[in-house]
């Protein structure tokens, strides 16, 4: 698999872009997660960044990527509404893995947003989408631009939701490369990796949380619920960071 030129690929018609990505994804599917990271660092353009929500399985991708690129910027979009356990988990992992953590936030504070818009997460799908745009999408776009990102690593997995079930290892998003090294992992592989490397799940895992985001849009799992139903009141799965 040869090196990719981002500007040349972006200049291609959509059909030719898709064909080029299909070809390389056919080969990436047969590599291990570690080999995918190594291939990306050798063949995709820098600057490289890694995003993390510091959710349930976050330690896996953080460890996997930083073993090969210790100083890679780790982007966190902090909404100001994360669980106290999440903030402590961020501190613990940042110290343990010596992360180059880069925190980006909305232009206005949570209090200012509530004064101006009310509690957007209580205003149906439209309110949730506006909340996500203000607190996640816009800060992430700003982060990618500020860090000059051309290749973006993320820890999504197909098993997590129906909307992620068809995601490829490598894609173009926001005009940059996006590589998902553990996209085909199942829960067992996540557990094995964490155990092998002395890493922990998010602290709320033991309290019955399968997915962790903001306090007001995250629910503990109950019998009969899918993982998707534990977020955003079951109205949607994605926060917008990994869409488009």
UniProtKB/Swiss-Prot annotation:
GO biological process: hydrogen sulfide biosynthetic process; sulfate assimilation, phosphoadenylyl sulfate reduction by phosphoadenylyl-sulfate reductase (thioredoxin)
Reactions catalysed, as given in the entry: [thioredoxin]-disulfide + sulfite + adenosine 3',5'-bisphosphate + 2 H(+) = [thioredoxin]-dithiol + 3'-phosphoadenylyl sulfate
Catalytic site: 239
Gene3D superfamilies (alphabetical): HUPs (3.40.50.620)
Top-level lineage group: Bacteria
Function (record text): Catalyzes the formation of sulfite from phosphoadenosine 5'-phosphosulfate (PAPS) using thioredoxin as an electron donor.
Protein family per UniProt: Belongs to the PAPS reductase family. CysH subfamily.
Protein name in the entry: Phosphoadenosine 5'-phosphosulfate reductase
UniProt organism field: Yersinia pseudotuberculosis serotype O:1b (strain IP 31758)
Upper lineage: Bacteria, Pseudomonadati, Pseudomonadota, Gammaproteobacteria, Enterobacterales
